[in-house]
């Protein structure tokens, strides 16, 4: 009650205790796992969520928030319809990938924490989308304080993956952004960035990284994003289940049905949001 701030009366608490003891009700497994721990004191309800959702309509927070929630174990859904992704500014023409130097003189020494990894992603996205002059379009970083691979992780459990998966992921995200220099990113680019974030978290050896992407029913690139039979599809796209927003099934593009014919993976559809 103190951690969740439920405001139950003593009578309500007693009744709830009785229901638990009589096995008439229960709470989610994540509550059983974490309630009463310092993790909940520090993170609040965020660490107890099974599901989360965001809209990709700004250049930083949707991605960093998704990374944070995935690292906490929540499944994350996200809307990347063109009407939302178009709200992001163009990628700066002077953006360059951050450079790893691994010494105390780096612009950013990545903290050995979930929050530190999220801040590294945020700095990269800020350099790409929001930097105001060329010298701010990149930065140097160090991974020297990140625990080595195989080191036990206290708190959420598991073992550390070391810094290499994070370095790989930020490099891949930077590659995607550089290809769009001077232009806005497309929904397929937003999907790739989210999927790479998911891959980083899976590689981090703590969570499985469940994602659900919601795109436009006429976005050909999105509809073909997981057509493995076409070849040259990035493996990280396996990180998300993909769905399309559509008011009328008759508006669905023919490519939508290919997944049900054994070509690629079948998509679901839902009403527009």
Tell me the role of every PLM-derived stretch:
Residues 1-273:
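Extended catalytic cores of very large enzyme megasubunits
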């Amino acid at each position: 009650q103190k951690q969740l701030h439920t405001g139950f009366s003593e009578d309500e608490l007693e009744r709830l205790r009785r229901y638990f003891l009589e096995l008439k009700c229960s709470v989610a497994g994540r509550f059983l796992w974490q309630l009463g721990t310092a993790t909940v004191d520090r993170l609040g309800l965020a660490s107890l969520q099974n599901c989360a959702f965001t809209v990709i309509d700004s250049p930083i927070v949707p991605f960093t928030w998704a990374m944070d929630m995935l690292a906490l174990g929540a499944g994350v859904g996200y809307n990347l319809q063109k009407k939302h992704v178009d709200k992001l500014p163009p990628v700066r023409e002077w953006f360059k990938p951050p450079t790893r130097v691994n010494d105390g003189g780096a612009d950013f020494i990545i903290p050995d924490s979930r929050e530190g990894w999220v801040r590294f992603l945020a700095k990269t996205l800020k350099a790409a989308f929001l930097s105001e002059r060329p010298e701010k379009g990149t930065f140097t970083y160090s991974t020297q304080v990140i625990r080595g691979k195989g080191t036990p992780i206290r708190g959420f459990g598991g073992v550390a993956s070391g810094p290499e998966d994070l370095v790989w992921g930020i490099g891949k995200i930077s590659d995607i952004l550089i290809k769009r220099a001077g232009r806005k990113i497309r929904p397929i680019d937003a999907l790739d960035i989210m999927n790479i974030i998911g891959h980083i978290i899976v590689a981090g050896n703590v969570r499985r990284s469940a994602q659900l992407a919601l795109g436009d029913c006429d976005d050909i690139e999105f509809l073909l994003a997981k057509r493995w039979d076409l070849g040259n599809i990035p493996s990280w796209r396996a990180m998300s289940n993909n769905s399309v927003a559509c008011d009328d099934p008759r508006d669905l593009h023919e490519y939508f049905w290919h997944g049900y014919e054994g070509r690629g993976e079948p998509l679901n559809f839902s009403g527009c949001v």
